[in-house]
């Protein structure tokens, strides 16, 4: 199910008032929605915007896509910047854990190829015809 964060029009004729809602992308603009996460009143001066930041960040983390107008509202409120920081902050952590895993010393359970890869990473010289026991001795 593709989920969108978009505006649901409320208010009277020529007096728009919008709710920021989480909805299935296939549902109509003013149709069924999953959750209300804010409001937007473009008539008031300045425009009145109320957003539930925690809920929006949660839905963005789950893959919800904001509409163009909602994207602008979130960007002006600074929510998209926080989401992008948290999203990019997670990626280097994953890379660090993979480096740590590859830096562990090999044991008897590792294959010869894994031991050779470890020795190559460490810069240790070995003969290509060396046996597993000889390679483990170099570690």
From Swiss-Prot:
Keyword Mitochondrion: no
Keywords: Ribonucleoprotein, Ribosomal protein
Gene3D superfamilies for this protein: 3.30.1320.10, SAP domain
Domain of life: Bacteria
Region (Disordered): 85-108
GO molecular function annotation: structural constituent of ribosome
Composition bias type Basic and acidic residues, residue spans: 97-108
Gene Ontology cellular component terms for the protein in this record: cytoplasm; small ribosomal subunit
InterPro entries assigned to the protein according to its UniProt record, in alphabetical order: Ribosomal_bS16, Ribosomal_bS16_CS, Ribosomal_bS16_dom_sf, SAP_dom_sf
GO biological process: translation
Similarity comment text for this entry: Belongs to the bacterial ribosomal protein bS16 family.
Name this polypeptide is given: Small ribosomal subunit protein bS16
Species the sequence originates in: Leuconostoc mesenteroides subsp. mesenteroides (strain ATCC 8293 / DSM 20343 / BCRC 11652 / CCM 1803 / JCM 6124 / NCDO 523 / NBRC 100496 / NCIMB 8023 / NCTC 12954 / NRRL B-1118 / 37Y)
């Amino acid at each position: 199910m593709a989920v969108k964060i978009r505006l649901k029009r409320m208010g009277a004729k020529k007096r728009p008032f919008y709710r920021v809602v989480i909805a299935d992308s296939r549902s109509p603009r003013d149709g069924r929605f999953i959750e209300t996460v804010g409001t937007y009143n473009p008539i008031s001066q300045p425009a009145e915007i109320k957003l539930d930041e925690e809920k929006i960040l949660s839905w963005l983390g789950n893959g919800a896509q904001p509409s163009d107008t909602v994207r602008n509202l979130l960007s002006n409120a600074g929510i998209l910047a926080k989401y992008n920081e948290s999203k990019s902050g997670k990626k280097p952590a994953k890379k660090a854990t993979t480096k740590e895993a590859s830096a562990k010393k090999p044991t008897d359970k590792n294959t010869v190829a894994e031991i050779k890869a470890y020795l190559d990473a460490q810069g240790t010289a070995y003969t290509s015809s060396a046996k597993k026991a000889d390679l483990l001795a170099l570690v």
